[in-house]
Structure formats: structure tokens, C-alpha cells
Amino acid sequence: ISYGDDELYNKNINKHSSEIAKDPLVRELVKNTLLTFYNDIPSGLVIEGRDMGSVVFPNAEFKIYLDADENIRGKRREHQSGSQETIEEIKQRDHKDMNREESPLVIPENAVIIDNTNKTKEETIEEIIEKLKL
């Protein structure tokens, strides 16, 4: 399922996603929807999200915990959405997500941790393939 970048990433969505994600009913609905979607795809899928490997798909064959410096993340987000997300907003979202009661942001068990602060998309993909031995 593909949406335009403007629909997936904009400052308004980023700002409110942590608040919405705190709601247990929303989390359960999203989780069940994703699991149903996954079960309909026999070849598997690649999915991104802050608790995909820890809560939604804890038994996934491959889990990547992708991290980068906050300044770089801010620049990348600006490039994606055309609007600037300040470093402070990124820090606040991380703090909220790590400290929320329902499904806090954690490094999933058995995840491969990759810091791509100084890597291009292509270099990041190469490292993932290498570390997962694909």
C-alpha cells in the first residue's frame, strides 16, 4: 500500500502520533489490523514502526533497530516532509515514546542494531543485508 510522502510524513502527523499511540484501544486496533494484513501475505513483509519488533511482531525472523543522531534525523525528516521538525521535537517524541505506559519504545529482543548517522540509504541497506546474511 503506497501513499504519497506528504500523507505519510508531515509535521502535524509527527507531532500527534506519540499522543495517539498512547491510547490502548488505538494500539490494539492497529496491531490487529497489521497482524491480519501480515497473515494474508504468505511471502512476509517489511514493516516500519517504533514497536513493530517488540510488540506487534515479537517473533519476527528479522528485526532491525535503526538509529541515527538527532540532528541527522531532523534533517532527514525535513527532506521527507518539507517541514522542519526541530531537534527538540524529536527528543520530546523519543522521550514520550520511551516512557509511555502502553508499548514503550525499546530495542527489541534479538534485533540487529544499526546506527546509520553517517550512512547513505544504499550503505544502510548493504549493512542490513550483510548483518542478516541475506
Regions found by a protein language model. Name each.
Residues 1-43, 71, 88-101, 121, ...:
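ATP-dependent small-molecule kinase phosphotransfer cores
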Residues 16, 47, 76, 115:
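Thr-Gly-centered strand-to-loop micro-motif
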Residues 19, 65, 112-113:
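Short aromatic/hydrophobic contact patches that present stacked aromatics
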